[in-house]
Amino acid sequence: MVVASAASPCESSALFATFDHDGDGRISAAELRLCMKTTLGEEVSDEEAGQLVASVDADGDGLLCEAEFVRLVQAAEVEEEDERRGTGLREAFGMYEMEGEGCITPTSLRRMLRRLGSDQDIDDCRAMICRFDLNGDGVLSFDEFKIMMNA
């Protein structure tokens, strides 16, 4: 869920001021919800806005000070980057997973490697898969593929 993006402290302060409609130095869940709708075009329920506030509300007052708001924005940016990375990994996984089985087999790995100009035999492909095959089933699931790509 996108909250906002602020690259510098000045931008963070300006963004905080935009979200702080009543100018009291705190952002309520209602202000957060309203600003997410009007500024970002993102609909969130009262409950979701409350959960967002609670996720970074260090002092437990139900409101966000500027530092808490900055933490919320930073967390949203990390989440967004993780989503982008996950989409890219899913697409890459799909290139190797050619047999419609939802996993990368030694055969599908060999096919893709050949397309990329590498002439690995099936035993080499089994050995590559074995290094990241955590459950020992002889194939790579998407989760195992993610681990391999992040290694």
UniProtKB/Swiss-Prot annotation:
EF-hand domain mapped to chain residues: 14-42, 44-79, 84-119, 120-151
Keyword Amino-acid biosynthesis: no
PROSITE patterns: EF_HAND_1, EF_HAND_2
InterPro entries associated with the record: EF-hand-dom_pair (IPR011992), EF_Hand_1_Ca_BS (IPR018247), EF_hand_dom (IPR002048), EF_hand_pair_protein_CML-like (IPR039647)
Pfam families noted in UniProt: EF-hand_7 (PF13499)
Superkingdom of the organism of origin: Eukaryota
Chain residues that bind Ca(2+) 2: 57, 59, 61, 68
Keywords in alphabetical order: Calcium, Metal-binding, Repeat
Positions that bind Ca(2+) 1: 20, 22, 24, 26, 31
Name of the featured protein: Probable calcium-binding protein CML31
Source organism of this protein record: Oryza sativa subsp. japonica
